[in-house]
Amino acid sequence: MNTENSFSQLYSELSLNPDLPTLAGRCMLLTEILLDCNAHPQTQPVCRCLGAYLEEVKSGLTESMRDFQIVEFEEDAEPPRQKAWLLEDTETKCDYCRAVNHVLLVSHFDRDMLPYLTGLLHEVAHSMAGDLITPAQPRMTIHLPARH
C-alpha cells in the first residue's frame, strides 16, 4: 500500500463515510498533533493518516461541488479562466494542505524547517476547516415578564 488512495483503507473511521465538517475537524486535530512533533520520523504516521483524511475531504468537495459548477454563461459575461465553484477557495486550501503534507511525508528537509512546515499546514488546514464547519447556532432565549 504505497499510494495515497489506499490510505483510506487503513482507517476504519473513514469507512463510515463521515461528512465534510467531521473530516475537517479530524484534519485540524491531526495538524495540531503535528505541531508537537519535533523530529521527521514522528511526523510520518500522522502525515499518513492526515493524507487519508485530506483525500476524503478532496473527494467530498469534488462530489458536493459538482452541482454548483457553472455550465453556461450569459453572452456578455466573461467566462471564468478555470472552474468556478462555490467553495473553490476551500478546494484550493485542501490542495495546499495535501501538498505540504506530501512534503512532510516524503521529503528530507532541515530539522529547523519542521516547525514552519507543520505550522503552515496547521494554519491552512484550520482555514479550510473554518470554511466547512459552521458554528453552532446560539440558542434563542425568551425572557417572560415576571408576574407580580
Segments predicted by a language model, with ranges:
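Sequence/structural signature of long amphipathic alpha-helices
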Residues: 1-148
